[in-house]
Amino acid sequence: MTQTEIIITVAACLIVLAQGIFLFIDAKKRNHMAWVWGIVGLIQAPMPLICYYFFVIRPDRKKRGIKQ
């Protein structure tokens, strides 16, 4: 592996790990299957984050009456 490939791989791993941690913590705060969202967030990026927004955050905001 070249140095560039190693840097890209490490950066991708950090992005996916940060996404998984964020999804787990936020889903736990909203009581929405925290473990499932955390594991799904570790699989790939950015689709789980986009799905989480449309399936959890957006309905939760509508439920609470918070406008974006």
UniProtKB/Swiss-Prot annotation:
Protein topology in the membrane: Multi-pass membrane protein
Transmembrane segments: 5-25, 37-57
Subcellular location, record wording: Cell membrane
GO cellular component term of the entry, any: plasma membrane
Keyword Membrane: yes
Residue stretches in coiled coil: none
Induction: Expression is sigma Y-dependent. Induced upon nitrogen starvation.
Taxonomic superkingdom: Bacteria
Keywords: Cell membrane, Membrane, Transmembrane, Transmembrane helix
Reported function: Together with YxlE, is important for negative regulation of sigma Y activity, being the major negative regulator.
Protein name: Negative regulatory protein YxlD
Organism: Bacillus subtilis (strain 168)
